[in-house]
Amino acid sequence: MACGEFSLIARYFDRVRSSRLDVETGIGDDCALLNIPEKQTLAISTDTLVAGNHFLPDIDPADLAYKALAVNLSDLAAMGADPAWLTLALTLPEVDEPWLEAFSDSLFALLNYYDMQLIGGDTTRGPLSMTLGIHGYIPAGRALKRSGAKPGDWIYVTGTPGDSAAGLAVLQNRLQVSEETDAHYLIQRHLRPTPRILHGQALRDIASAAIDLSDGLISDLGHIVKASGCGARVDVDALPKSDAMMRHVDDGQALRWALSGGEDYELCFTVPELNRGALDVAIGQLGVPFTCIGQMSADIEGLNFVRDGMPVTFDWKGYDHFATP
């Protein structure tokens, strides 16, 4: 039997579940009605994902749903927010019920993990794409921003940037990885990145600035540099790289992916000298390595790199949707 828009929503997206107490009205009315907790600042982010641009057209729908939500959660993580609500506008070329079942099951599994609620959205026919609006909140005055870095602050990254680009290369057969465990790890880092929600929350009163690594370290740290109005010096020898990647590529390729590969969804953040001890206490037990890779400076402009103490330059840039090929 054909599945119309409203029956599609009812069957796959209006799940019976324990509702959040801050949702007065969710799916089923003209608007969602939300009650914002007292002394909290609302945090909102929106992302559009298009088949063939942001994800491979033949991607497993469960992986697609996970990644679509995870990359939005990463935006909340970068500002230290608590996740709360999601809207989803989904454009489909046709109603494929097995696809929708796998997609919605995966989406709700991650929503439930973070105690989030889908509160509304839209469905329409067309080339496969989706727009997610994610909402959360942050204690007033404690949000992490890109603009707070000061000269002398230390620059850190979580995890091992470059893994996602390596995983994409494996999926596209541009990188041959003979070890199954390494291939699986790299592919999962691309398809199912882990949003660093707990790290962002722990950094609220410790970091001076933060951003998530969506377009590559060169591009994203560059945003902190520009917004904060001071330069940055990065030691490329300090950049962390996973063994799974390093076993299969040379140092040059690994460095390129670490700096400009994108889609790692790790956090890059700056910490004043006074807070470095507190940083170890705050996120040292969260199970994800974090590495100091450089320092903000008033003596230089823009983003600068050094290797063995000597300046080096790179022509690489981060991802840009509208860049000329």
From Swiss-Prot:
Mg(2+) 5 binds at residue 215. Mg(2+) 3 binds at residues 30, 75, 212. GO terms for molecular function: ATP binding; magnesium ion binding; thiamine-phosphate kinase activity. Gene3D superfamilies: PurM-like C-terminal domain (3.90.650.10), PurM-like, N-terminal domain (3.30.1330.10). Its EC number is 2.7.4.16. GO terms for biological process: thiamine biosynthetic process; thiamine diphosphate biosynthetic process. Mg(2+) 1 binds at residues 46-47, 122. This is Thiamine-monophosphate kinase. It comes from Salmonella typhimurium (strain LT2 / SGSC1412 / ATCC 700720). The gene is thiL.
